[in-house]
A protein has these predicted regions:
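Surface-exposed loop/linker segments characteristic of extracytoplasmic
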Residues: 1-228
Length: 228
């Protein structure tokens, strides 16, 4: 059981922005409105929170919405990745990237090569949502874990984009090119920053071939491509 003192301390952590996770070209290092009241499991819910302008690579799978903090019982834990539990759809999808819900990816699993597989990168965010907290991809805290706030896809429906005005489209049990809060992207004019699993960082143009971008998100599809 999480005690009251620890919940309060975790709230303080949630409220605290971290400069390393903020793109200075996009927004200031400050706390922004927390729009998911009641959603935190192990901490008291704050009014404001620190956010991240960077996201993990979940791979090239089609995004599937999920709403679970994790298995609540031993039985659920045993069935968590077999597809029988709707709330565990993300795990059952067996993502091809390196960081996702309950991921345990080691370097030996990245058979396409560490330098040819994305680790993380800048995330797309509409300019009108930089401070609002109303974007579905930027409404929670830096420390929330697996969520579109911290996780993005390289599926060809979701090419990297320069920040632009976009509608708020809620991903339910479908996915299409209008759901932009799974895209990587940035505020920069011609390219975004992507880090590979070997620690190298490169600029990737918004005009990158969608198939190349997609394959760089998959750690083990055998379709090895050279990052542009």
């Amino acid at each position: 059981t999480i005690g009251a003192e620890r919940r309060a301390r975790l709230r303080t952590m949630t409220e605290t922005p971290v400069a390393a996770f903020v793109c200075p070209s996009r927004r200031a290092v400050q706390a922004f409105p927390f729009r998911r009241d009641g959603s935190l499991v192990n901490a008291d819910n704050p009014d404001v929170c620190g956010r991240s302008d960077y996201a993990a690579n979940i791979g090239d799978a089609v995004p599937v919405d999920q709403r679970a903090a994790g298995p609540k019982t031993w039985e659920e834990g045993l069935a968590w990745d077999d597809g029988s539990l709707p709330e565990a759809a993300w795990v059952a999808a067996r993502h091809s990237g390196v960081m996702f819900q309950l991921s345990r990816v080691a370097p030996r699993h990245i058979t396409d090569g560490l330098s040819k597989t994305y680790l993380l990168g800048e995330k797309f965010l509409p300019p009108e949502e930089y401070e609002s907290g109303y974007s579905f991809g930027d409404d929670q805290a830096l420390y929330v874990g697996f969520d579109r706030d911290q996780s993005r896809s390289t599926h060809r429906l979701h090419p990297p984009l320069r920040d632009r005005t976009a509608p708020r489209v809620w991903l339910k049990d479908r996915d299409d090119e209008t759901v932009l809060d799974w895209n990587f992207g940035s505020t920069h004019h011609q390219s975004l920053g992507m880090a590979s699993c070997d620690g190298s960082v490169r600029r990737v143009g918004y005009d990158v071939d969608p198939v190349v971008h997609e394959r760089l998100g998959n750690r083990a599809d055998g379709q090895i491509v050279q990052p542009e």
